[in-house]
């Protein structure tokens, strides 16, 4: 709405740019629900590094929630990259990111088992702040899918890296892992309402 219907206009010397002053009245309106899936690569490890906190410590969870809230409530992002394993993205070949892994992996006597509690906490934060969808971290390295992502596990009582750049993506060992992991992940996500 312009007072008295008058537009105040001051053009520059060439007449190419101008400023105008007016009063804008914003009515009460609500946009329809967003239907576009808007995902972003959300690097939880970078937040831990930047703020100097231990990955998945309570302070890190507080920081994550602040950024998830901003993404979902302020920026219309309704899907986030979810680090079930440390995402093998934006690294040099043979490089590693700081470990941020939401799925606990165990291998005892060659048998895999998985814990999804941290993934459930992440999903709860996302849903609470309008992020309805999860983009699961890539299961292969970014540069040609030649290798496996870094995956940490407790193997016979000792935590260690079981996959990474040194393990080919097409290896029988990784295939056996995926055959155990993917059905368990699907069941866990369905249990969380996905």
How would you label these PLM feature ranges?
Residues 1-194:
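Aromatic-lined carbohydrate-binding surfaces of glycoside hydrolases
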């Amino acid at each position: 709405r312009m007072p008295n219907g008058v537009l105040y206009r001051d053009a520059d010397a060439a007449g190419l740019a101008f400023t105008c002053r007016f009063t804008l009245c914003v009515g009460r309106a609500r946009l329809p629900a967003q239907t576009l899936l808007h995902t972003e690569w959300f690097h939880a490890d970078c937040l831990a590094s930047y703020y100097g906190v231990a990955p998945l410590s309570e302070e890190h969870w507080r920081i994550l929630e602040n950024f998830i809230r901003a993404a979902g409530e302020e920026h219309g992002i309704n899907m986030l990259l979810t680090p079930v394993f440390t995402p093998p993205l934006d690294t040099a070949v043979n490089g590693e990111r700081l470990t941020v892994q939401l799925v606990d992996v165990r291998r005892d006597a060659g048998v895999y088992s998985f814990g999804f509690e941290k993934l459930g906490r992440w999903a709860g934060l996302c849903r609470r702040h309008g992020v309805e969808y999860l983009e699961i971290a890539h299961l292969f390295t970014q540069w040609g899918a030649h290798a496996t992502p870094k995956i940490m596990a407790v193997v016979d009582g000792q935590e260690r890296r079981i996959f990474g750049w040194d393990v080919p993506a097409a290896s029988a060992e990784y295939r056996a892992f995926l055959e155990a992991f993917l059905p368990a992940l699907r069941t866990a996500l369905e249990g969380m309402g996905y």
